Amino acid sequence: MSIFSIVTAPDERLKQKSKPVLECTDQTRKFMHDMLETMYNADGAGLAAVQVGILLRILVIDIKEYDPVERPKDFYPLFIVNPEIIEKSTELVTANEGCISLPKQRIEVTRPESVKIRYLDYHGKSQELKANDWLARVIQHEYDHLEGKLMVDYLSNLKRDVVLRKLKKLKNNIV
């Protein structure tokens, strides 16, 4: 297993739209496992491939410790390839979010309370999943990454600029 470096804002790759995966191969599955290890290493709940510099429509999610919904034992981790949101609730919920590509930042984001997605699973089989609560939020957050959208994009221009300046300063002090 490999642990990848995390791409952090204001890196321009995070603003690009990811491309579909053509086929779920052994190489794709190894990459997803490496993404998962990287996510665990960064104490994340989810990770999009773009966050490790690969512009493919792949997500990994594991929130079993925080999910209020009782799920089958083998439900997590979720490997989600080429997701599309096919349904969103009209009920909106605002909650505080963090992101491993935006270190030390917490932002209030309003999102639909539930979503239904269609995707390919770990084996390349088509699946549908209706998610609500925290899982819906994590799916939407990670899906935004595939679309080149960050949680700071939900802020006003002024607030977004302040956060991005902080991140740039943080990045320059670290590198």
Curated annotation (Swiss-Prot):
- EC number(s) given by UniProt: 3.5.1.88
**InterPro entries according to UniProt:** Peptide_deformylase, Peptide_deformylase_sf
Q: Name the enzyme's class.
A: hydrolase
Give the domain of life: Bacteria
Q: Where is the active site?
A: 142
Tell me which cofactor or cofactors this protein depends on.
Fe(2+)
The cofactor note reads: Binds 1 Fe(2+) ion.
What does it catalyze? N-terminal N-formyl-L-methionyl-[peptide] + H2O = N-terminal L-methionyl-[peptide] + formate
Residues holding Fe cation: 99, 141, 145
Q: Name one GO biological process term.
A: translation
Q: Which UniProt keywords apply?
A: Hydrolase, Iron, Metal-binding, Protein biosynthesis
Which Gene3D superfamilies does UniProt cross-reference here?
Peptide deformylase (3.90.45.10)
User: Which Gene Ontology molecular function entries are recorded, alphabetically?
Assistant: metal ion binding; peptide deformylase activity
Q: Give the family, as the similarity comment puts it.
A: Belongs to the polypeptide deformylase family.
Q: What does this protein do?
A: Removes the formyl group from the N-terminal Met of newly synthesized proteins. Requires at least a dipeptide for an efficient rate of reaction. N-terminal L-methionine is a prerequisite for activity but the enzyme has broad specificity at other positions.
The name under which this protein is listed is Peptide deformylase
